[in-house]
Design a protein with these regions (language model features):
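Active-site acidic catalytic loop and adjacent metal/ATP-binding pocket
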Residues: 36-48, 52-53, 85, 177-223
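Juxta-kinase regulatory segment immediately upstream of eukaryotic protein kinase catalytic domains
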Residues: 1-27
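ATP/Mg2+ or Mg2+-diphosphate-binding catalytic cores
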Residues: 4, 275-307
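Protein kinase glycine-rich loop
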Residues: 31-34
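A conserved alpha-helical element in kinase catalytic cores
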Residues: 52-96, 112, 117-123
Length: 307
């Protein structure tokens, strides 16, 4: 993981504008967007149309980026809330792969309060629709070893839990390891429906977008729902009630099997425990990163109520 952060692209707005103009004749103003290991820019052309320029980490596999493009084209036939490709081509600039997708309007779910039941049901519905859209998609590059894959959760905990400074939190995290059932259904999943990747129309209070297919992986199908719930329940007075709304919406669009329902809460806890462990690993590499410490506070406060 540490190697990724040594190869983050370093383009400014002016160079991003020049890049898309030279490659594809798109002329517009560029504004940087948040990204952890890559670089994204919002591009607005003279007509007011908006695009997102995505500049990948130099260590990102080109085959995996091709898989992302293939997935976006595949799901675009069934859903309208995922980024669509503006240009099929993946260009290479200074060892970084470069793509352009359509901009999706909306406010991150993390910035919407309160999360009313109807909105949470819509989060579930949209995820169920995506699970259905991805159910017949596959690509060799998504069959990969990925540290955020829930299937690797026990290993992540074993490796990084010793780095968690708080002893009681460390013990709690170790207790979140799961025994996976061999019968659990597998498919390609988006893999990161956290509350900053889910976009909401703040007036209509419906989901308008799901961003960032960079964590896409072939894994447990129910993991898609578990990951979303892991973030929805944070700081909620009644986390189970909030989760039930998401589950209801999801199940209305995509059938859940009994063994998946049985594994849902263990996987929710596993995801949060993985987040604690991975953050501890990142803090070892970046001890001055106060954002990492602050971002974990909600998880540390919420996890005990889910045990």
């Amino acid at each position: 993981m540490a190697q990724l952060f040594k190869h983050v692209p370093d383009f400014n707005a002016a160079s991003a504008e020049a890049l898309v103009a030279e490659l594809w004749g798109i002329r517009g103003r560029a504004q940087p967007l948040p990204s952890e290991r890559d670089q994204n820019f919002l591009l607005t052309d003279g007509a007011g149309e908006k695009f997102v320029l995505k500049i990948a980490n130099a260590l990102e596999s080109r085959a995996f980026l091709e898989a992302q493009n293939a997935a976006l084209k595949h799901v675009a036939q069934r859903v309208s809330f995922c980024p669509s490709l503006v240009i099929d081509e993946i260009a290479t600039v200074k060892a970084h792969s470069v793509r352009v997708v359509r901009y999706l309007p909306g406010v991150p779910l993390a910035q919407i309060r309160p999360h009313k039941p109807a909105l949470l049901r819509d989060v579930g519905r949209k995820l169920g629709q995506l699970s259905h859209a991805l159910s017949d998609f596959d690509h060799p590059a998504v069959h990969r070893e990925f540290h955020w894959d829930l299937a690797n959760g026990n290993r992540v905990i074993d490796e990084f839990a010793p780095l968690v400074e708080d002893a009681s939190l460390r013990e709690m995290v170790l207790g979140c390891k799961v025994e996976f059932k061999s019968a659990l259904r597998r498919s390609v999943i988006h893999g990161d429906a956290n509350d900053y990747n889910v976009l909401v129309d703040p007036e209509r209070m419906i989901v308008t977008g799901l961003l960032d297919f960079g964590d896409m992986v072939y894994s447990y199908t129910v993991g898609e729902l578990a990951i979303a719930i892991a973030y929805v329940v944070l700081d909620k007075p009644d986390p189970r009630a909030a989760a039930d709304q998401v589950i209801e919406g999801y199940a209305s669009e995509f059938r859940l099997f009994e063994e998946e329902l049985e594994m849902l809460w263990p996987l929710v806890r596993l995801r949060l425990a993985m987040s604690v462990c991975i953050a501890a690993s990142q803090l070892r590499e970046q001890p001055e990163n106060e954002y990492l410490r602050v971002s974990q506070k909600s998880i540390e406060a919420s996890l005990p109520r889910l045990i």
